[in-house]
Amino acid sequence: MKKIVFSAFVLMGMASFLIGCKKKEAPLPEYVKQTMNLVWSDEFDYEGKPDASKWTYSMGNLNGWGNGEIQKYTDKPENVNVHDGVCTITALREGNSNRWTSARMKTEHLGKWQGGYIEVRAKLPKGTGTWPAIWMMPEANKYGQWPRSGEIDIMEHVGFDQDRVHGTIHTKAFNHKIGTQKTRSDILKGATKDFHNYAVYWTQDVIRWVYDGETFYEFQNTGNGWEEWPFDHPFYLILNIAIGGTWGGEKGIDKELKKATMDVDYVRVYQ
């Protein structure tokens, strides 16, 4: 009986430890605490499909999503589901084929923000060929189609370059098609093993990437017009795992890889 009781306490302790690891949060920067309030969040403190009042989905494979990606996006529970306080996006290989399904959840038409502190706590997938991203796109194309109206990549990671994370913006003047994108990349140890906080602090003067509470990169508004700074209108948030593509698939897709997951602890927006 003593062994049974002891084992129960051990299991309870382990569970508490694991929950504590997941819920340990990076501190908010003081400049956010002092000037902003929480205006939108999803803590994923429920079970089942993500809250339909906050999230919608991209579906199918729209010409490889402009990047040669091979996954087909769905909103099926095997590709996106909330359980035990975490929203999990799962990319799945279909049998032994080269066909994949995944999910791309977004706040388009449901949540949009012009400026603020947009924060996502997530654990990234492993595996060559995976391409997870936390990013923002314009609710309306004020200055025209991509990249004229802007894109904010809060975080990207490609599986062939383990634990290296990237923060990037795209505009008419600065984008990867012409090799001028403004970006920083660096190793974040444990990005695929542990939860980390990925955020941008966005004002009319600067976009600042903040990882685990520390400044990672900054892009300044130099006042040279919308071609460089189209960030004067609302953007929505996107969370996804892509498979393959011009960047994610640069080193191929691991033939042994059957499944890849990105776990999201919470999403919070301050203004």
What do the PLM-derived regions correspond to, one by one?
Residues 21-271:
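GH16 jelly-roll
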Residues 1-28:
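Bacterial Sec-dependent N-terminal signal peptides
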